[in-house]
Amino acid sequence: MKKLILSAALLAASLASQAQQGPLWMRYPAISPDGSTIAFAYKGDLYCVPAQGGEARQLTTNAAYDSQPIWSPDGKKIAFTSNREGSLDVYVISTKGGAPTRLTTNSGKETPIAFKDNDHVLFSANIMPTAQSNLFAANEFSQVYEVSTEGGRPKLYSVLPMENISINKNGQVLYHDKKGYEDAWRKHHTSPITRDIWMLDNGKYQKLTTFKGEDRNPVWAADNQSFYYLSEQDGSFNIYRRNIASGKDTQITQQKKNPIRFLTSSDNGLLCYGFDGEIYTVKEGGQPQKVNISITTDNDEPSLIRKVQSWGATEIALSPDAKEVAFVMHGDVYVTSTEYKTTKRITDTPQQERNLSFAPDGRSLVY
C-alpha cells in the first residue's frame, strides 16, 4: 500500500513538473501597445496571451507556417508573415481572430517590419529596386515597402535595407542596418559588417551606435528621447537603454549564458523579449519576469516523419576500399554501402558536422 501511495505521489509530482515547464521555443513575442497582451509564434501558428501569463488563445490555425506578429498602434490588428499561398506573404488579422487578409502577392519573400500607422504596414521584400541603387538586388539586401491594410499595390518606402523598424508618434524612425551576409543568429560576431542602429528624421540619417559587435532591434522609449535595444557589448545579447542626445547607455538586463531575442516595448514601458525558448517581461529598474504560459491544442504533427531523399548531401567521402560512402545530411553524418541498400546514421547532434574523411583502415571517421 505504501509503495502504491509513493508511486502515485511520484507520478503526480512528475505531471506537475511537466505542467510547470510549459511550452518551449515560443518565438517572435510582440507586446501590445497597451501592454496587456503578448502575441507570439509557436509551432507555425500565432497565439495571444495576457502579459501576466495564463492560457494562450490560438489566433491562427492554418496548416501553413505563420510567424513574426506585429501590432498596429491602436492594438486592433496584427500583421504577420505566412506561406499559406506558397511563398511568404504579409497578412493582417483582427486581434479578435477570424480570417486574415492577404496584403502581398509577390512570388518572393515578404515579412512585416512595422505598422507605419493604423492603416499601413511596412514590410521587407525584393520587388522593384530602383536603377539608382548601388546595392545588388538579392534577398539578403531587401528594400522596404508599405502597403494598405486593405491590400493594393505596394509603394517603395526605402531602397536601403532597414530591419526592426520602430516609429514613434513624432514620425521618427529607428532601425538597424544590414551590411553583409552574416547569419542573424550568429553570436559573438565582430567585424565591419555587424549591425548598427540608425535614426531617420525628416529625411536625415543619423548613426546612433558604433560598437564593433552587434547592436540591433531598437524600440522607442516612452519619452521619445531614448530607445531600448539589444547589444552584445558585455559578451551576450542584453537590453540597454540609450539617450540619443548624450549617447549614454543604461544596462537593463544581465544575462550571461544565452542571448536575448525579439525585443518589443509597450507604450507604458513594459519590455517583452524571448530568452532560452521562453517569454519574459521587464520594466526598467525591475527584475525580469517569466511569462508562464499554457497552451492547449491538438498535436497536428506526427511524432516521426519518414523522408526519402535523393539529394541534399553537403559533403561526401569515399572509404579506402571504395565500399562505403560517408556524407553529411541536415548537419549529421551518414554512411552508406556501395554494394548494398544499407545506410546508417552515425551522428545525431544539434550541432553541424562537416569536413569528413575516413581513417586509413576504413573503420573510423574523422570530422
Protein language model regions, located:
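Positively charged n-region of N-terminal signal peptides that target proteins for export
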Residues: 1-4
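A flexible loop/linker signature enriched in serine peptidases of the S9 family
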Residues: 20-23, 41-47, 55, 60-66, ...
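Residue-level detector of Asp-centered blade-edge/turn motifs that repeat once per structural unit
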Residues: 33-34, 73-74, 116-117, 168-170, ...
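Acidic/charged, solvent-exposed loop-and-adjacent secondary-structure segments enriched in E/D, K/R, S/T
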Residues: 290
